[in-house]
From Swiss-Prot:
The lineage of its organism: Eukaryota, Metazoa, Chordata, Craniata, Vertebrata. One of its GO terms (molecular function) is SNAP receptor activity. The modification Phosphoserine is found at S137, S164, S168, S174, S177. Keywords: Acetylation, Coiled coil, Endoplasmic reticulum, ER-Golgi transport, Golgi apparatus, Membrane, Phosphoprotein, Protein transport, Transmembrane, Transmembrane helix, Transport. This is Vesicle-trafficking protein SEC22b.
Length: 215
C-alpha cells in the first residue's frame, strides 16, 4: 500500500506537495516517516543517486529525482518496487507538466498542495488489485529495478553523509566489480593462448621429427 507521498525541491529540500494516508491510526504512525522524509530531502544534492530505495523497518521509501525535483513515496515493504517506481514516474510526468516551470521561483512550503488531488487519484489506481495487475503488464519496459541503489534510512540519516557519498561508494563497488570481470577475462584469454601455443609447438616438433627421421 502507498502510505505517504512527498515532492520536494532538491536544491534546498523545500517541500512542494504531499499526500498522507487518511486513516487516523496510520496518520499517527506516519508522522515519524514524514519527519524522516524531510530530513532526507535536506541531504539530497545534484550528485545524489536519481533512483533509490531506503528500508525503514516494515516500510520502504522509494524516490526518483527529475529536473531538480525529488518524488518520494513510502510503501509497505511488500509493495512491489516496480509499481512504486512506475507510480513515481507518473507523478513526475504530471507534476512537471503542471508546475515544472514554477518550481525554481516558489519560496513557500507546499506551494503546490493542490497537486494532492492528482496524487490521490493515482494512488487509488496503484492500490487497486486489478489495476495493479494491469500496470504490472504494461510497465515491463520500466528500467531494471534491481539496479536501483538500496540503503537503510536510519543509517543514512544517522551517519550524516550526503547521499552523494553513498552513491560514490556504490559506483566504486561497481568499478571494482567491472575491473574484476575484465581481469578475469584477460586471464582466461591468456590461458587459452597458452594452451594454443603448446598445441602449436607440439605439432611443429612432430613435423620436424617426421621430416628429419623418416624422410
Amino acid at each position: 500500500m502507498v502510505l505517504l507521498t512527498m515532492i520536494a525541491r532538491v536544491a534546498d529540500g523545500l517541500p512542494l506537495a504531499a499526500s498522507m494516508q487518511e486513516d487516523e491510526q496510520s496518520g499517527r504512525d506516519l508522522q515519524q516517516y514524514q519527519s524522516q522524509a524531510k530530513q532526507l530531502f535536506r541531504k539530497l544534492n545534484e550528485q545524489s543517486p536519481t533512483r533509490c530505495t531506503l528500508g525503514a523497518g516494515a516500510m520502504t521509501f522509494h524516490y526518483i529525482i527529475e529536473q531538480g525535483v525529488c518524488y518520494l513515496v513510502l510503501c509497505e515493504a511488500a509493495f512491489p518496487k516496480k509499481l512504486a517506481f512506475a507510480y513515481l514516474e507518473d507523478l513526475h510526468s504530471e507534476f512537471d507538466e503542471q508546475h515544472g516551470k514554477k518550481v525554481p521561483t516558489v519560496s513557500r512550503p507546499y506551494s503546490f498542495i493542490e497537486f494532492d488531488t492528482f496524487i490521490q487519484k493515482t494512488k487509488k489506481l496503484y492500490i487497486d488489485s486489478r489495476a495493479r495487475r494491469n500496470l504490472g503488464s504494461i510497465n515491463t519496459e520500466l528500467q531494471d529495478v534491481q539496479r536501483i541503489m538500496v540503503a537503510n534510512i536510519e543509517e543514512v540519516l544517522q551517519r550524516g553523509e550526503a547521499l552523494s557519498a553513498l552513491d560514490s561508494k556504490a559506483n566504486n563497488l561497481s568499478s571494482l566489480s567491472k575491473k574484476y570481470r575484465q581481469d578475469a577475462k584477460y586471464l582466461n584469454m591468456r590461458s587459452t593462448y597458452a594452451k594454443l601455443a603448446a598445441v602449436a609447438v607440439f605439432f611443429i616438433m612432430l613435423i620436424v621429427y617426421v621430416r628429419f627421421w623418416w624422410l
